[in-house]
Regions:
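Short, exposed beta-strand-loop hairpins at the edges of beta-sheets
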Residues: 103-106, 110-121
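Short helix/turn-capping signatures at newly exposed starts of structured segments
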Residues: 1-92, 96-98, 121, 127-134
Length: 134
């Protein structure tokens, strides 16, 4: 799963990537909901569902959220992506979340990984596309 997350981070941070490119990469049953595209049964091993959210332009992805079949241990994420920054839960009473700033050298954008930690690890991860500030 770590290798898949790294690959998707490079994809989402690529200059010129579109929502359609990312949906094609996920290769599942896609349903366009206007603001986002739900992808059921993506071809990514270990992923049950994905949601690709559009940025304000409607063309590029803002982020992609993956619902995982098996949790990824927090220790594996930290060993692979470095020390995370805790961020507030998505909603009151929601799972703890950890933000990993990823070192993606791929043009004008970079990526961050936000892991929702419950029990044995992260069952939901979000890869966010961020403009490179430095």
């Amino acid at each position: 799963m770590i290798a898949t997350l790294r690959e998707l981070a490079v994809t989402i941070a690529s200059d010129g990537v579109t929502v359609d490119d990312l949906v094609h990469r996920l290769d599942g049953t896609a349903v366009d909901m206007i603001g986002n595209v739900l992808v059921d049964s993506p071809s990514l091993e270990g992923v049950a569902q994905a949601s690709v959210v559009r940025d304000a332009s409607g063309e590029a992805p803002a982020h992609v959220t993956l619902e995982l079949i098996d949790p990824v241990p927090e220790e594996a994420l930290t060993a692979s992506f470095g020390t995370p920054t805790p961020v507030p839960p998505e909603f009151p009473g929601g799972p703890d979340r950890l933000l990993y700033e990823l070192e993606v050298r791929n043009g004008a954008y970079t990526a961050a990984l936000i892991a929702s930690i419950e029990g044995q690890g992260a069952r939901r991860v979000t890869l966010r596309r961020d403009p490179r500030l430095r």
